[in-house]
């Protein structure tokens, strides 16, 4: 059912049947370390490049999710996946052995939200019994692609965020579980003209604000109708900006807001500056922390809003602004 300007409410809500998370060593040392399904001994995952390591994480996450659901790849109708690298090579190489029909997606760090939205639409529309969603990011591969090789040892400003080395995989289907996707709000591109690639939180906060408000308008809800409103990776800088933007529009989500980039690392002892980011940040946190809280009934309804800064090395070097996008996924206990 179409809701408002940008949202869909599902009459037959798809379920998140199972999920899995794979992360690197630093993430395993953070507050959620014991909750992840797999923590690498180092960030190479037995490979000889950062990019291959990221593909290995995706492969492991998919296999773990399928194993936990007692399924084979043949039970999946379509795969929706993405990462931060050029042409989505981490995903292509990571899932090729599964031989599942695939949609390769790019929404920067919002890709997990985009993928979950599309997968749930397909299931709700009857185009398949089960879909597989997977996204990933890697600190080493992202730094090499968008900033500087690690061996360069450049200084990072305090507004910079630490790209999470991690992957999350989710099986979205018709079989009942304790978490269902009851609706989605598809985000718009929001551009405030910012150009600082070392301050991604500021670039993404306006898009998060836009989607959160639109979700409440489309579904005719208030902040208190959600136990948590969870953004993907605004970090400490972006969260502060989000609160200011929401306040200007007479909304207050302070008491209910959580950010995956602020949750996955311990700011006081891990020196990640403004927090975590990356396609794997929201995905791994969703699998390891958010879904269990919903499944247990601790949270009854959550608005999950992965956020992305839409830039490339070319657009940045040509002086283009960095617009943001955010997709809202309504998750409910059942």
Say what each PLM segment does.
Residues 1-51, 149-213, 218-221, 252-271, ...:
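Condensing-enzyme catalytic core mediating Claisen C-C bond formation in acyl metabolism
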Residues 54-70, 116-118, 203-218, 285-290:
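Short, well-ordered amphipathic alpha-helical segments that serve as non-catalytic structural scaffolds
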Residues 88-89, 139-144, 189-193, 311-313:
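Short, well-ordered, mixed-charge alpha-helical segments that flank or form enzyme active sites
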Residues 92-95, 234-249, 314-321:
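Short glycine/threonine-rich loop-to-helix capping motif typified by GTGT followed
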């Amino acid at each position: 059912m179409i809701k408002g300007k940008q949202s869909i409410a599902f009459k037959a809500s798809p379920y998140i049947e199972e999920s899995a998370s794979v992360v690197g060593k630093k993430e395993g040392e953070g507050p959620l370390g014991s909750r992840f399904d797999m923590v690498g001994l180092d960030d190479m995952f037995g490979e000889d490049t950062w990019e291959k390591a990221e593909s290995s994480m995706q492969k492991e996450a998919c296999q773990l999710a399928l194993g936990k659901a007692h399924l084979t790849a043949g039970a999946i109708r379509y795969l929706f996946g993405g990462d931060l690298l050029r042409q989505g090579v981490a995903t292509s190489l990571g899932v090729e052995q599964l031989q599942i029909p695939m949609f390769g997606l790019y929404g920067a760090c919002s890709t997990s939200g985009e993928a979950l939205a599309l997968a749930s639409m397909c299931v709700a529309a009857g185009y398949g019994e089960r879909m597989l969603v997977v996204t990933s990011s890697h600190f080493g591969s992202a730094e090499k692609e968008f900033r500087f090789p690690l061996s360069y040892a450049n200084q990072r400003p305090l507004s910079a965020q630490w790209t999470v080395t991690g992957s999350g995989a989710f099986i979205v289907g018709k079989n009942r579980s304790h978490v269902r996707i009851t609706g989605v709000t598809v985000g718009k591109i929001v551009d405030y003209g910012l150009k600082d690639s070392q301050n991604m939180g500021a670039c993404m906060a306006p898009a998060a604000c836009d989607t959160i408000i639109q979700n409440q308008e489309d579904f005719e809800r208030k902040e208190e109708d959600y136990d948590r409103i969870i953004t993907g990776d605004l970090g400490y800088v972006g969260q502060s900006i989000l609160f200011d933007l929401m306040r200007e529009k007479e909304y207050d989500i302070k008491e209910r807001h959580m950010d995956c980039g602020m949750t996955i690392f311990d700011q006081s002892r891990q020196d990640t500056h403004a927090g975590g980011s990356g396609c794997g940040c929201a995905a791994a946190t969703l699998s390891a922390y958010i879904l269990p809280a919903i499944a247990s009934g601790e949270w009854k309804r959550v608005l999950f809003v992965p956020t992305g800064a839409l830039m490339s090395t070319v657009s940045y070097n040509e002086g283009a602004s960095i617009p943001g996008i955010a997709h809202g996924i309504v998750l409910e206990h059942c």
